[in-house]
C-alpha cells in the first residue's frame, strides 16, 4: 500500500486502485487478500446505479478486468457503464445508438471488449461498436432471442438461443443473407446458451422442457449429455460454466440451483435455503470467487443468495443438498432476476424488476449503504394488495402497468404492484372457483404478458392464474403479507384503501372497462382462429400463458396512450392495433408450423439403407418395447420416417433389383459359411451373440439324427434353384401371413419377418437383441421342442416351406411339433430334389433363395415378373454350384453347427451322414416322394 502512495495521493477510487495495484513479491497475495476479505463478510456494501426506465433484464461485465458493464431491459435501450466513473462521480451511462423494438433479454461482450451483442423480444441480434456506439450489423431470427454467447477463441463466432427452440451458430463475417449453422432444434424454447471457456467446441444449453444439455458443435441435432439423472426433463432457465469449464451451474424452475460435473448426468450439489424460491420470473445464476468457490442466484423473495461450494464431494448427504446460504444480500425492493460477479474487483451486480442496478462490494464505496456485519437494516415494505394494483392501473389512465414515455428512473409503483401480485399468487395458491370483480379479471387478462423476461412467468401469467376473493379493507390493513424482513425504504407507497371515485371517474372507468372487454374479445378471437387443431391449441396456450412474450409499446403507442387517457376512442384504436399484432403473430406461427411440416415429406427418399451391402446381415427383430418416443425423440422420429416405407408397395425397378441382389448376397454368404464347416470349424454363431445371427451351440444336439433327416437337411440347404412362378401372387402370399402370429409353425413366423427385411433392414439393425421371448426352444434328437404346450400339427398343405431362410429367426420363437416339422421338411426335399432343377414349375409356396423376392412379387405390378425371373434364374445357377460344394460338408462328422434358418438341421445331417452311399439311397427316396408331392401340388393349384 505504501509503495503506491506516491503514485497518486489523489487516487480516491477503490475500484481504480484494485484494478491498477500490483503487489511485489508473491503474485498470489492479491487473490489471497480478496479471498480472505470476502470470507470474513456477513454482508456487503451496496449502491444503486440509475439510468433505465424499466425492468433491467440483462447485465454483463466486460472481460479482462470488468472495467465496463453493459445493461439492457424493457426500455429497449443498451447502456454502457464505466464502473469507476459510475460509482464515484455519478456519470450517466453511454447509450448505444442501436435500439431494439421490444424488450432486451440478453447481452454479450466479445473477448476484446470492442463489440457488444444484444438480443431481445424483437427477434433480432444487434451488433454494436463500443467506441463509436454505432450499429455494425443486425442478425434476424424467427422468434425472441433469450441467450447469447461469444466464442472464447474467435470473436467472429457467436451462439444464440431463441424461443423457436433453435440454437444457432453465427459468423459475423458472412453476408447478411447467409444462413447460420443450426446446432439444436427442439419444439420448446432455449433460454440460455454458453460456450465452454476452455473447450470452445462444447456448448451448454438450458431448455424450457428438456432441461440442461451439453452439445458438441461437431455433432449437431443431438446432445452429448442431458443432465439431471431421472429428472432430466425439467424446466431450465439458465446455465453457466465455471472458469475451468469443468462444472456447470444451472437454474431450474421451482427447484434449487444445481451444480453438475460436465462428465456426469447426476448432480454434484444442490443449494437451498429457507425463503429461497424461483417460480415467478426468469432468472440467471453465476459463479463467484477467484476459484469459483461460490455461486449466486436471485430469488422471488427480493433477496440475493450466495452459497459456498463444499470442498468435500460427499457433503450434503444422500441428496447432496447444501442447506444454508453463505450470505443473503438484502436490499432489493422487488424480484431479483440477474446477477454477475467480477473476479478482478470482487464486485457483484444484480438487477430485476426495479429500474436500478445494485452494486455489491466488500469495499466501501462513495455514497454506499450497509455494512459488512449486517447490523444496519433497511426498512421493510409490504407487498401491494391486488386491489391496490388494480387501482393503480385504472387510475393511471393508460391501461398499462408500465410507462416508458415519461423516461423516469424513479420507481414505478404499478410495476412493483404487478409483480407483487405474481408473488402473492404463487405463495398463497389462489383457488380457481373464487368470485372476483370483473374489472380485476379484465385487467389481468390485459396484462397477461406485461414485462416479460423481467416478469415473465415460466408457466403462469397473470391471465392464466386463478383468482382469489378480494379481501376486505380490514383484512388488507391487518393481514399485510410480508416476505420476511424486506429491508428496503418505503417510498412511493399507496394507501391500502383506494379513494372513492366520483361520478365522472366512475363513468370514465366504465368506458375503459368496456374498451378492455372489446380488446379481450378480439384477442380471444385471434387465438381461436389460430388454434386450428388440438396441437395448435396447446401451442397457443404455451405461447400466451406459459411463456408470454409481450412487446413494449412503441413511442407512437406511448404518446397516444398518454395523451388520450380520458378518450375511449383512442384506447379502442390502441386495442385494435394490439389485436392486429396478435393476428400477425398467429399467422407467422402458422407459417412457421407449415414450414416445419414440409421438410418431413422428402425425408422418405433418404432411405439409403437398401442399397448398401455391408455383409453384416443382422437378425430381424421387433422394435425395443422399452423405449418410447418421449424418452428418445431422435429415435422415434427416425422410426416414424422409415416405417411408412415398409408398408408401401415398391414399384421402382432399381429397388427390386437391389432386393434380389441383397437376397442373393445373403444366400451366398450363408452357403459359403456352411461349406467352410467341412474343415472342422466351429459354429460362427452361438445363441444370439454374433452379428445378430441366431445360432446354437454344439452341445444342444447330443443325439444324431437318422439318415433320412440328414438328407432332408441337405435338401434344405440346396433347394433354392427354382424360378418364382407367376402364380405366386398376392393371394398366395396372403394365405401364409394369417398363420404367422401364433398358431403357425415357427418357420412361418420367420418367413413373414424376412419378407419385410428389404425395406427396414437398417432400422432393425440398431435394435438387435433387445426383445426377450417368453419361451425357449431346445433340440432333442434333431427335433424342435417348445417349453409351452405342443400344438396340433398343421394341415397337409405345405405352407411357408422356404421360410427357413429367415435371417432373424434368432429373435422369432420356433415352436413346432415333431410331425409338422417332418412334414414340412419332406415337402421341401421333394420340391427341390437336392439341387437339381425341375423341368416343371416349382411349388407355389417356394420361398427358397427367392424369399427375399417374395415381397416384390406380392406387392409389385405383374410387369416386374420378367425381371425377377431373369435375376432369379441367374441366382439359381450360381447357387447350384454352391450347393454342390455344400454336399461335401456332410462327410465330415461333428462339424460346427449353425442354426441359421437356411441350415437349421445341418448339425444333425453332419453327424448322421458318413458316405456317398447313404446319399444315393436317400436321393432315391426323395424321387419317390416327388410323385406324392406333385399330386398335392395339383390339388393346391385347383
UniProtKB/Swiss-Prot annotation:
Residues the record lists as Phosphoserine modifications: 531, 533, 626, 628, 645, 648, 651, 794
Composition bias, Polar residues: 454-465, 760-770, 801-815
This protein's pathway: Protein modification; protein ubiquitination
InterPro entries (UniProt xref): DCAF8, WD40/YVTN_repeat-like_dom_sf, WD40_repeat_dom_sf, WD40_rpt
SUPFAM superfamilies: WD40 repeat-like
Pfam families in the record: WD40
Bias-annotated ranges (Basic and acidic residues): 690-701, 728-738
Tissue: Ubiquitous.
Residue ranges of WD repeats: 51-91, 99-139, 140-180, 185-225, 277-317, 331-370
Compositional bias of kind Low complexity: 625-641
Record key words, sorted: Phosphoprotein, Repeat, Ubl conjugation pathway, WD repeat
Residues modified as Phosphothreonine: 500
Keyword field contains Phosphoprotein: yes
GO cellular component: Cul4-RING E3 ubiquitin ligase complex; cytoplasm; nucleoplasm
Biological process according to GO: negative regulation of fatty acid biosynthetic process; protein ubiquitination
Residue span of region Disordered: 449-478, 490-509, 544-655, 676-824, 889-942
Record text on subunit structure and interactions: Interacts with DDB1, CUL4A or CUL4B. Interacts with L3MBTL3. Interacts with DNMT1. Interacts with E2F1. Interacts with SOX2.
Function (record text): Is a substrate receptor for the CUL4-DDB1 E3 ubiquitin-protein ligase complex (CRL4). The complex CRL4-DCAF5 is involved in the ubiquitination of a set of methylated non-histone proteins, including SOX2, DNMT1 and E2F1.
Full protein name: DDB1- and CUL4-associated factor 5
Lineage start: Eukaryota, Metazoa, Chordata, Craniata, Vertebrata
Amino acid at each position: 500500500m505504501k509503495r503506491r502512495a506516491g503514485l497518486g495521493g489523489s487516487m480516491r477510487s477503490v475500484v481504480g486502485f484494485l484494478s491498477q495495484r500490483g503487489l511485489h513479491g508473491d503474485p498470489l497475495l492479491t487473490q489471497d487478500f480478496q479471498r480472505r476479505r470476502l470470507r470474513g463478510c456477513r454482508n456487503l456494501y451496496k449502491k444503486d446505479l440509475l439510468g433505465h426506465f424499466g425492468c433491467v433484464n440483462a447485465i454483463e461485465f466486460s472481460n479482462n478486468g470488468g472495467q465496463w458493464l453493459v445493461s439492457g431491459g424493457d426500455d429497449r435501450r443498451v447502456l454502457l457503464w464505466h464502473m469507476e466513473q459510475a460509482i464515484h462521480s455519478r456519470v450517466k451511462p453511454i447509450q448505444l445508438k442501436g435500439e431494439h423494438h421490444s424488450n432486451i433479454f440478453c447481452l454479450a461482450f466479445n473477448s476484446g471488449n470492442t463489440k457488444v451483442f444484444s438480443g431481445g423480444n424483437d427477434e433480432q441480434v444487434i451488433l454494436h461498436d463500443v467506441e463509436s456506439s454505432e450499429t455494425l450489423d443486425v442478425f434476424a431470427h424467427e422468434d425472441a432471442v433469450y441467450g447469447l454467447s461469444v466464442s472464447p477463441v474467435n470473436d467472429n463466432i457467436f451462439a444464440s438461443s431463441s424461443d423457436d427452440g433453435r440454437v444457432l451458430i453465427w459468423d459475423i463475417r458472412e453476408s447478411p443473407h447467409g444462413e447460420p449453422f443450426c446446432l439444436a432444434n427442439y419444439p420448446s424454447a432455449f433460454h440460455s446458451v454458453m460456450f465452454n471457456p476452455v473447450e470452445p467446441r462444447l456448448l451448454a444449453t438450458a431448455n424450457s422442457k428438456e432441461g440442461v444439455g451439453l452439445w458438441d458443435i461437431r455433432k449437431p441435432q443431438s446432445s452429448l449429455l442431458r443432465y439431471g439423472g431421472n429428472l432430466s426433463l425439467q424446466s431450465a432457465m439458465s446455465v453457466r460454466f465455471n472458469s475451468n469449464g469443468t462444472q456447470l451451474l444451472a437454474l431450474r424452475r421451482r427447484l434449487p440451483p444445481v451444480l453438475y460435473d460436465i462428465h456426469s448426468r447426476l448432480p454434484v450439489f444442490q443449494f437451498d435455503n429457507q425463503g429461497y424460491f424461483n417460480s415467478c420470473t426468469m432468472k440467471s445464476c453465476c459463479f463467484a470467487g477467484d476459484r469459483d468457490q461460490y455461486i449466486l442466484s436471485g430469488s422471488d423473495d427480493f433477496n440475493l443468495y450466495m452459497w459456498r461450494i463444499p470442498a468435500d464431494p460427499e457433503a450434503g448427504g444422500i441428496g447432496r443438498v447444501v442447506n444454508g446460504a453463505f450470505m443473503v444480500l438484502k436490499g432489493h425492493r422487488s424480484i431479483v432476476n440477474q446477477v454477475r460477479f467480477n473476479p478482478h474487483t470482487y464486485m457483484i451486480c444484480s438487477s430485476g424488476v426495479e429500474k436500478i442496478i445494485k452494486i455489491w462490494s466488500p469495499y466501501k464505496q462513495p455514497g454506499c449503504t450497509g455494512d459488512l456485519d449486517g447490523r444496519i437494516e433497511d426498512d421493510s415494505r409490504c407487498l401491494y394488495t391486488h386491489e391496490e394494483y388494480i387501482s393503480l392501473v385504472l387510475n393511471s389512465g393508460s391501461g398499462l402497468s408500465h410507462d416508458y414515455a415519461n423516461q423516469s428512473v424513479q420507481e414505478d409503483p404499478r410495476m412493483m404492484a404487478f409483480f407483487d401480485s405474481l408473488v402473492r399468487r404463487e405463495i398463497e395458491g389462489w383457488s380457481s372457483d373464487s368470485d372476483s370483480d370483473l374489472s380485476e379479471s379484465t385487467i389481468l387478462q390485459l396484462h397477461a404478458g406485461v414485462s416479460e423476461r423481467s416478469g415473465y412467468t415460466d408457466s403462469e401469467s397473470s391471465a392464466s392464474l386463478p383468482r382469489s376473493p378480494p379481501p376486505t379493507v380490514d383484512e388488507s390493513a391487518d393481514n399485510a403479507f410480508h416476505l420476511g424482513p424486506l429491508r428496503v425504504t418505503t417510498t412511493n407507497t399507496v394507501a391500502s384503501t383506494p379513494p372513492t371515485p366520483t361520478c365522472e371517474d366512475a363513468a370514465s372507468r366504465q368506458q375503459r372497462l368496456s374498451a378492455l372487454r372489446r380488446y379481450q374479445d378480439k384477442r380471444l378471437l385471434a387465438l381461436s382462429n389460430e388454434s386450428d387443431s388440438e396441437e395448435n391449441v396447446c401451442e397457443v396456450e404455451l405461447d400466451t400463458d406459459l411463456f408470454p412474450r409481450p412487446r413494449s409499446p412503441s413511442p407512437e403507442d406511448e404518446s397516444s396512450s398518454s395523451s388520450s387517457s380520458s378518450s375511449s376512442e383512442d384506447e379502442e384504436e390502441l386495442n385494435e392495433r394490439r389485436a392486429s399484432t396478435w393476428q400477425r403473430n398467429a399467422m407467422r406461427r402458422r407459417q412457421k408450423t407449415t414450414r416445419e411440416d414440409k421438410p418431413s415429406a422428402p425425408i422418405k427418399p433418404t432411405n439409403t439403407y437398401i442399397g448398401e451391402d455391408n455383409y453384416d446381415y443382422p437378425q430381424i427383430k421387433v422394435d425395443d418395447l422399452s423405449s418410447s418416443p418421449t424418452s428418445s425423440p431422435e429415435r422415434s422420429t427416425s422410426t416414424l420416417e422409415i416405417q411408412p416405407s415398409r408398408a408401401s408397395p415398391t414399384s421402382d425397378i432399381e429397388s427390386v433389383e437391389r432386393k434380389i441382389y441383397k437376397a442373393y448376397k445373403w444366400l451366398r454368404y450363408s452357403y459359403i459359411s456352411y461349406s467352410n464347416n467341412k474343415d472342422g470349424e466351429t459354429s460362427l454363431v452361438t445363441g444370439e451373440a454374433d452379428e445378430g445371427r441366431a445360432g446354437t451351440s454344439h452341445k444342444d444336439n447330443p443325439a444324431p439324427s437318422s439318415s433320412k433327416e440328414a438328407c432332408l437337411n441337405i435338401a434344405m440347404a440346396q433347394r433354392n434353384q427354382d424360378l418364382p412362378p407367376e402364380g405366386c401372387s398376392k393371394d398366395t402370399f396372403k394365405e401364409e401371413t394369417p398363420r404367422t402370429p401364433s398358431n403357425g409353425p415357427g418357420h412361418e413366423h420367420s418367413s413373414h419377418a424376412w419378407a419385410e427385411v428389404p425395406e427396414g433392414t437398417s432400422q432393425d439393425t440398431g435394435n438387435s437383441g433387445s426383445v426377450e421371448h417368453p419361451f425357449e426352444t431346445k433340440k432333442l434328437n434333431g427335433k424342435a421342442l417348445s417349453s409351452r404346450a405342443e400344438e396340433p400339427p398343421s394341415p397337409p398343405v405345405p405352407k411357408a416351406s422356404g421360410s427357413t431362410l429367415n435371417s432373424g429367426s434368432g429373435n422369432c420363437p420356433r415352436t413346432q411339433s415333431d410331425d409338422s416339422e417332418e412334414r414340412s421338411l419332406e415337402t421341401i426335399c421333394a420340391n427341390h430334389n437336392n439341387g437339381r432343377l425341375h423341368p416343371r414349375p416349382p411349388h407355389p409356396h417356394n420361398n427358397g433363395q427367392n424369399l427375399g423376392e417374395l415381397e416384390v412379387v406380392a406387392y409389385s405390378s405383374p410387369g416386374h415378373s420378367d425381371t425377377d425371373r431373369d435375376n432369379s434364374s441367374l441366382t439359381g445357377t450360381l447357387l447350384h454350384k454352391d450347393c454342390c460344394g455344400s454336399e461335401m460338408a456332410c462327410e465330415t462328422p461333428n462339424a460346427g453347427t449353425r442354426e441359421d434358418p437356411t441350415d437349421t438341421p445341418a448339425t444333425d445331417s453332419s453327424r448322421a451322414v458318413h458316405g456317398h452311399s447313404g446319399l444315393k439311397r436317400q436321393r432315391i427316396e426323395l424321387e419317390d416322394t416327388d410323385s406324392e408331392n406333385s399330386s398335392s401340388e395339383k390339388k393346391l393349384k385347383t
